[in-house]
Amino acid sequence: MATLLPGVSFDNGGCHAPARALIDAGAALALATNFNPRHTPTLSMQAVIALACLRMGLTAAEAISAATINGAHALGCADRVGSLEPGKSADLLLLDVSDYREIARQFGVNLVRLTMKRGKLIYKAGEVARRPRPELRRE
């Protein structure tokens, strides 16, 4: 599994991994943010997906697969996360787009309207779900 870091191109003079050639040769790709203090720190997977499409030649469907199920395979946890299937953790985002291909065209815009982790709502349209405070034990 080739894991590509589209955000690094901002730090290395615009060079990119040959993503299209790798896919055309039959390789499976994963996408990652490469968040670290030394090289272009990027937290946004939306930005990574957009860069993969705009600069590396991936289609929106290829980039989304590389960021989700293929990323889970690269991390060795595809049996638990990476796709919506019975028995897997329901980690998902609801994005404000009418067509999935818009994700790659709206660079720099936060499209997230809802976030769920393990089936529980943690973010909804501008508000963060409150976590119950743990009870303090009296000793």
Predicted features by range, described:
Residues 134-139:
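Intrinsic disorder/low-complexity segments
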Residues 13-97:
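His/Asp/Glu-enriched, well-ordered alpha-helical/loop segment
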Residues 6-8, 35, 99-101:
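Short, well-ordered turn and helix-capping elements at secondary-structure junctions
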Residues 67, 89-133:
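C-terminal cap of metal-dependent C-N hydrolases
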Residues 1-14, 122-123:
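Active-site core of metal-dependent hydrolases
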